[in-house]
Amino acid sequence: MSNPVTKSPNSDQSISLLLNELKTVNGHFLIVADENWDSVNWVDFLNHSSCNVSIISNRYDIAQKAETASISTYFNDLDFSGFKPKSFDGIFFRVSKERANTHHVINQSAYLLKPGATLMLSGEKNDGIKSYVKKACMLFNTSSIPTKFGNQYLAKINISEPNNSKKLDDSNYPSMQAVKVLSEYGLTSKPGVFGWNKIDRGSAFFVDHLPTLMSRFKQSPRTLLDLGCGYGFLCYQAKFFDIKNITATDNNAAALIAVEANFKHSECNVEIVASDVGDVITKHFDTIWCNPPFHKGFIIDNDLTYRFLEATCRLLAPNGHAFYVVNSFIPLERKAHGLFSSIQLAADNGSFKVIALSNA
């Protein structure tokens, strides 16, 4: 494990550690690729690796990139049931930002790995990598000391028969769950969705101002796009404004499952779409609502907000209105300049701000 980290611009160096290891091994390996794997050049990886690799990803954009490189790829909510038991010589996983996701992957590795196979974990100290390695070792009755490479750590855990009493708490990862704070809205959620067990403060601020925002319409809008829908908190409010046609899109498989469950009995016409910032959507919408992310995994992505704004400009109907909520420090107004003829600050509480956009 003495391979140097191959660096590339904006790359996650914990992932570079795993990719370097994959260049040295032979066998059948599974990469669990979440949003942290965004910068990987899969074609280049294949050119430098001789092993048989499959990829499972809970992110639509990551899965599409890997599939385009002709890698065997599975896009789902980290559902490993489609794989044969004990079919892999190793699993490579950069620990997730969400604890439940990481615990779920470690638990499932007991089902997926051959006896004596290897679970490779990487991450930084502040990501909890040492704690995850310790828990995984307790599960598999083994020991492993993570190797330090700069700020990153890499751990090789040799698998033995698991001690099921030491399974990690994954918050019942596969299941839709009633969340007390969401119950008054009739909503459920699940692990794997960002902020799955709470109401995002920015989204709550947005909803508080929806009546004022919607007064900009002379006639009630007929179509809504929730761009980056999560479990559906924003678009669920459409029923209060008589919007009957809703499109909810996200790149996160868990979010798509959750929003589908929340609209299962809705009287609205709801279309749920897996996309990379709306890339596969072509129709136009009277209104677009968005609480965009500005992180990809552990890394701040300064281009992400602009990508959401570009998609909004493309998908907004000529007389439509789009409404965004972002942290107050995000320069959304500046980023929107040149895309929209009208950019108005509708509300600001010092922590979050709501921006109204249109080309009407």
What name fits each language-model region?
Residues G90-A100, L227-G232, F285-F298, T312:
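Conserved proline-anchored active-site loop of SAM-dependent methyltransferases
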Residues Y74, P146, T188, E271-V273, ...:
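General small-molecule cofactor/ligand-binding pocket signal
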Residues N3-S72, R201-C290:
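Conserved SAM/SAH cofactor-binding pocket of Class I
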Residues N101-A178:
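N-terminal auxiliary segments of SAM/dcSAM-dependent transferases
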